[in-house]
């Protein structure tokens, strides 16, 4: 599973989520990519992305996140970027930041994320960009890139929906979703998330809650 992960320096959780067996065959590799945001992409990261020949990018973030964390793009970038004009998360922040409000322990963090996942499929702007995502997959003849802020919750939901739609086995769907917990430099990613959460809500959240 880990060989799906591309070794980028400034982009978290960049990986290929194709290659799985389906009801009618197998998803192609080199066509379906997912990641976190690209605001910290290095020049070598951008060169690698350019070599993937990505035709469409689906940005699951809302307006607030896209303004705070503008993505860097390769030279001669020509991919079409699809997004919803509005907020795809309830507070305008990424789901893991939204869920962190009034959370101090791992148990509270888990309960908050369960509540958040129950709400995500019914958020109008997220549903809007998911429609764009599936439309892009139906129309595209090249590679697509799916991303949000952390490349975890909204991106994980969208990738899992695609996998289930085409008949990827549930065990593979779950394994791909959970690969986020191992992809790339986890400690660095957790540290970045902790900094953002504590900057928004103060230092009360313990380390176990951050990792939940």
Which residues does each predicted region cover?
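Ser/Thr-glycine-rich phosphate-binding loops at phosphate-binding pockets of nucleotides
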Residues: 150, 154-155
């Amino acid at each position: 599973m880990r060989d799906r992960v591309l070794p980028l320096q400034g982009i978290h959780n960049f990986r290929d989520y194709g290659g799985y067996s389906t009801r009618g065959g197998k998803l192609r590799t080199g066509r379906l990519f997912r990641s976190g945001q690209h605001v910290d992409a290095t020049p070598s990261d951008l060169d690698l992305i350019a070599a993937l020949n990505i035709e469409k990018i689906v940005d699951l973030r809302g307006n607030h996140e896209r303004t705070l964390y503008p993505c860097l793009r390769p030279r001669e970038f020509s991919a079409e970027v699809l997004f919803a004009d509005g907020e795809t998360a309830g507070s305008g922040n990424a789901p893991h930041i939204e869920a962190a409000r009034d959370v101090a322990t791992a148990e509270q963090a888990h309960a908050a994320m369960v509540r958040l996942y129950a709400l995500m499929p019914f958020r109008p702007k997220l549903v809007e960009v998911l429609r764009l995502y599936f439309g892009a997959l139906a129309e595209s003849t090249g590679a697509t890139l799916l991303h949000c802020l952390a490349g975890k919750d909204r991106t994980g939901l969208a990738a899992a929906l695609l996998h289930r739609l085409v008949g990827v086995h549930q065990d593979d769907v779950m394994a791909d979703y959970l690969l986020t917990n191992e992809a790339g430099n986890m400690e660095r990613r957790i540290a970045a998330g902790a900094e953002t959460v504590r900057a928004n809500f103060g230092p009360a959240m313990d380390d176990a809650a951050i990792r939940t």
